[in-house]
Amino acid sequence: MLAAEVAGLGNYGMRGTRHSVGMEVLDRLARQLAVAEGWRVDKRCCADVALATAHGLELVLLKPRRFMNLNGLSVASAAEIYSLGPGDIYLVHDDLDKALGKVAIKLGGSARGHNGVQSCISALQSNEMTRLRIGIGRPEGDVTVPNYVLSPFSAGEREKLDQILAQAVTCLLEHIQSRAPAEPGDRG
C-alpha cells in the first residue's frame, strides 16, 4: 500500500493560535478518518502520531511536539521511520498571504518566509513537499507579524474556523485521492 505523511505544522502547546492552525486541521482530519482516539506520542520523532487510511493510501498523521522553527526535525524523522520521501509528505500550515478562509494546495517551492516550512526544507534537504496552505490574513494596524501569528483567533474568526477546517480537510483528501492508485476496473 502506498503511504503519505501529513504533518500539521505549529507550535506545540500553543493550540488555538493562528500559527498552529495546521495542527487543528490534523485534529479535524483524524476525526473524519475515525482515528481521533489513535494519537500516540512517538518519542522517535518527537511528535503525536496517528495512522489512518484514505483512498487506498496509508497515512501517517503527525503533529510535532516542537516549536514551529524545529518542526522539520519531527517531519524528517517520521519520514525516515516510515520510509517516505519528500514527495510523499504534505505540510499543512498557516499562510499570511492568503485571506482568512482561503485554502490552497501548493506543489513544492520555497518556504515564502514560513519558518516551519523552512525547517522542513532544511531537515529533508528538499522542497518537494506538497503544502496545504490555510489563509490567516495579515495583521491590521501596528500589530507585528509575530504577535499576530502567535495570538488566538478572534471570536469572529473562530466562528468561521469550523467551516475553514472542513474545507481544508476536503481539499487535502481530494488531493490525496488524486494520488491514490486506481481501483481495479477503473479506466482513468
Annotated model-derived regions:
Residues 1-108, 118, 122-132, 139-144, ...:
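Nucleotide and nucleotide-moiety/phosphate-recognizing core
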Residues 104-110, 148-153:
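Short glycine-enriched, charge-decorated loop/helix-capping segments at active-site entrances
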